[in-house]
């Protein structure tokens, strides 16, 4: 009611092309007195109380509306995508698919330009209902990504059973990618498995040039993280994308010294 919630967005790039191909929407709470509340604090409370359902509906429409505006203004590619995180409470809401449909209609965005991001934990809680909802979303063209992949307990069985289209490699693996052989082997295995299943892969939390070079060597073509861009406000996205699009192929034009 006080309009203290807002969205920021982090660009996702194609490492080989150097293009911004999509964005992830992230929620922020800035109070009237100027202080900020961490999502790690308010999201669990919103989930527990159920208020995450209306908040999530607002965020979904807001994110898609931002994307439609950027496309119309020529800020990003016409096929750029928006990734929106969805909580267990939202996914188990019987009206969720209708909410997604309405947001797509009101924003005039095609379904295949929306990524719904869920964690493996979402599929542990009431798996049959989660499976039904994700299948219905997939049927209308919305794509599903597993966020923080590799940190859960039943990843492989979920990949076989659920309609998953993308794996987002958790930042804990990326942190040690350039310096730890075991981390590199794990990331290589995840990428190879995803490729064999026809799944898209995005590396999260890329913060150093060395990590980006390592991802390029492992043929992971999509990435996001502070090296590329911090989450930015909708108003500053035009200058952010313009700056990123001028860089070109990231590993080649940011050589290691």
Residue ranges and their predicted role:
Residues 39, 93-98, 127-131, 156, ...:
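Conserved strand-to-helix beginnings and helix N-cap segments that scaffold or border functional pockets
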Residues 44, 93, 161, 179, ...:
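Phosphate-coordinating loops and pocket residues in cytosolic domains that bind phosphorylated ligands
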Residues 186:
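Conserved N-terminal phosphate-binding loop of PLP-dependent enzymes in the Aspartate aminotransferase
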């Amino acid at each position: 009611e006080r309009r203290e919630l807002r969205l920021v967005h982090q660009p996702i790039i194609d490492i080989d092309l150097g293009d911004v191909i999509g964005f992830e929407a992230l929620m922020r709470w800035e109070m009237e007195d100027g202080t900020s509340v961490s999502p790690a604090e308010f999201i669990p409370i919103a989930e527990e109380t159920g208020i995450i359902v209306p908040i999530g509906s607002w965020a979904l429409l807001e994110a898609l509306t931002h994307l439609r505006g950027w496309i119309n203004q020529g800020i990003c590619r016409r096929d750029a995508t928006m990734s929106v995180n969805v909580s267990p409470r939202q996914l188990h809401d019987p009206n969720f698919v209708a909410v997604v449909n309405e947001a797509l209609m009101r924003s005039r965005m095609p379904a295949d330009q929306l990524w719904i991001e869920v964690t493996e934990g979402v599929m542990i809680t009431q798996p049959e209902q989660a499976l039904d909802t994700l299948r219905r979303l997939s049927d209308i063209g919305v794509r599903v990504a597993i966020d923080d992949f590799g940190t859960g307990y039943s990843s492989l069985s979920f990949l076989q059973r659920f309609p998953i289209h993308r794996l987002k490699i958790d930042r804990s693996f990326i942190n040690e990618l350039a310096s730890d052989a075991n981390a590199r082997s794990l990331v290589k295995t995840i990428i190879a498995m995803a490729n064999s299943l026809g799944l898209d892969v995005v590396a999260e939390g890329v913060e150093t040039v060395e990590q980006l070079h390592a991802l390029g060597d492992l043929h992971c073509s999509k990435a996001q993280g502070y090296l590329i861009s911090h989450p930015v406000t909708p108003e500053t996205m035009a200058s952010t994308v313009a700056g990123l699009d001028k860089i070109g192929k990231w590993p080649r034009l940011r050589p290691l010294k």
